[in-house]
From Swiss-Prot:
GO terms for cellular component: extracellular region. It is found in: Secreted. Keywords: Disulfide bond, Secreted, Signal. It comes from Lychas mucronatus (Chinese swimming scorpion). This is Potassium channel toxin alpha-KTx 27.3. The keyword RNA-binding does not apply. Belongs to the short scorpion toxin superfamily. Potassium channel inhibitor family. Alpha-KTx 27 subfamily. Has the structural arrangement of an alpha-helix connected to antiparallel beta-sheets by disulfide bonds (CS-alpha/beta). Residues 1-17 form the signal peptide. Its main location: secreted. InterPro entries: Scorpion_toxin-like_sf (IPR036574). Expressed by the venom gland. Gene3D superfamilies: Knottin, scorpion toxin-like. Transmembrane segments: none annotated.
Length: 66
C-alpha cells in the first residue's frame, strides 16, 4: 500500500513539474522545442489548450538572455 502511495506521489510531482509556455503548438509538440530551450527547460511534454508545456529543468525554466 505504501508503494502505491509513493508511486502516486511521484506521478503527481511529475505532472505538476511542468511550466506553461505561451508559444502555440499547433501542428505538434515539436514546435515547442525551441521555446522550451530558450527558457532552459527540458523537452516539451505535451500541448495543453494549444500551448506548450515544458518539464522544469535545472534552471527552473529561467528566461535565457538570448
Amino acid at each position: 500500500m505504501k508503494l502505491m502511495w509513493l508511486l502516486f506521489l511521484c506521478v503527481l510531482a511529475f505532472s505538476i513539474a511542468q511550466i506553461y509556455i505561451s508559444d502555440p503548438c499547433a501542428g505538434g509538440v515539436h514546435r515547442c522545442y525551441e521555446p522550451c530551450e530558450k527558457k532552459k527547460c527540458r523537452l516539451p511534454h505535451k500541448c495543453i489548450n494549444g500551448r506548450c508545456t515544458c518539464y522544469v529543468g535545472r534552471n527552473v525554466c529561467a528566461i535565457s538572455s538570448h
